[in-house]
Amino acid sequence: MSVSLSRLERQLGYTFKDQELMVLALTHRSFAGRNNERLEFLGDAILNFVAGEALFDRFPLAREGQLSRLRARLVKGETLAVLARGFDLGDYLRLGSGELKSGGFRRESILADALEALIGAIYLDAGMEVARERVLAWLAGEFEGLTLVDTNKDPKTRLQEFLQSRGCELPRYEVVDIQGEPHCRTFFVECEVVLLNEKSRGQGVSRRIAEQVAAAAALIALGVENGND
């Protein structure tokens, strides 16, 4: 992290009163000493709240499930990593030697986590209103492209995007049974999601349909959707 932090502050649009908070937010767990994981936890909560509040105001007729899907798109790791790269955040990260050699400063998850940590650091440094203003400014371009049409995605896509937004492994689908004659088969599929203790299940006249039903059941089990969306 040899580049001047003042340059990063200009890119972020915020100047820290406590520079140590900023440095901590940029410190990966592979680096010796304290790291940014607690700030990341805090920043993730703030990000989800600010994005949810803004979507609630922007889409007054949207249902709960639609709002959840829009928020998942806004806060997913891919989106945050794109923002982080726009700030050249990788130039400022404090990484352990092994992580540095393996190119950790370019890794999507590390960049996204550091950006969330910076949100947490700004909150501690200046309070909620400033943190909200920065988050909304950074996400302005993403908000401009959002419509409720974005919620009309199939359950498998919605489940994948939700899991990606949480930095989780993608779901695994398995056909566990096929019943009926060749011209009239019913497929039975199980969907394994790392956040759930039990696999969700679905059935349909094709494997694709059964997977969609299983994905929809997983979304309900996760509390992302309520079955009426």
Swiss-Prot record:
GO terms for cellular component: cytoplasm. The keyword rRNA processing applies. Residues 154-224 form the DRBM domain. Mg(2+) binds at residues 40, 113, 116. It is found in: Cytoplasm. The active site is at 44, 116. GO terms for molecular function: double-stranded RNA binding; metal ion binding; ribonuclease III activity; rRNA binding. Its cofactor is Mg(2+). It catalyses: Endonucleolytic cleavage to 5'-phosphomonoester. Gene3D superfamilies: 3.30.160.20, Ribonuclease III domain. InterPro entries: dsRBD_dom (IPR014720), RNase_III (IPR011907), RNase_III_dom (IPR000999), RNase_III_sf (IPR036389). PROSITE patterns: DS_RBD, RNASE_3_1, RNASE_3_2. Its EC number is 3.1.26.3. Residues 5-127 form the RNase III domain. CDD domains: DSRM_RNAse_III_family, RIBOc. Keywords: Cytoplasm, Endonuclease, Hydrolase, Magnesium, Metal-binding, mRNA processing, Nuclease, RNA-binding, rRNA processing, rRNA-binding, tRNA processing. GO terms for biological process: mRNA processing; regulation of gene expression; rRNA processing; tRNA processing. Belongs to the ribonuclease III family. HAMAP family: RNase_III. Digests double-stranded RNA. Involved in the processing of primary rRNA transcript to yield the immediate precursors to the large and small rRNAs (23S and 16S). Processes some mRNAs, and tRNAs when they are encoded in the rRNA operon. Processes pre-crRNA and tracrRNA of type II CRISPR loci if present in the organism. Homodimer. This is Ribonuclease 3. It comes from Pseudomonas fluorescens (strain Pf0-1). The gene is rnc.
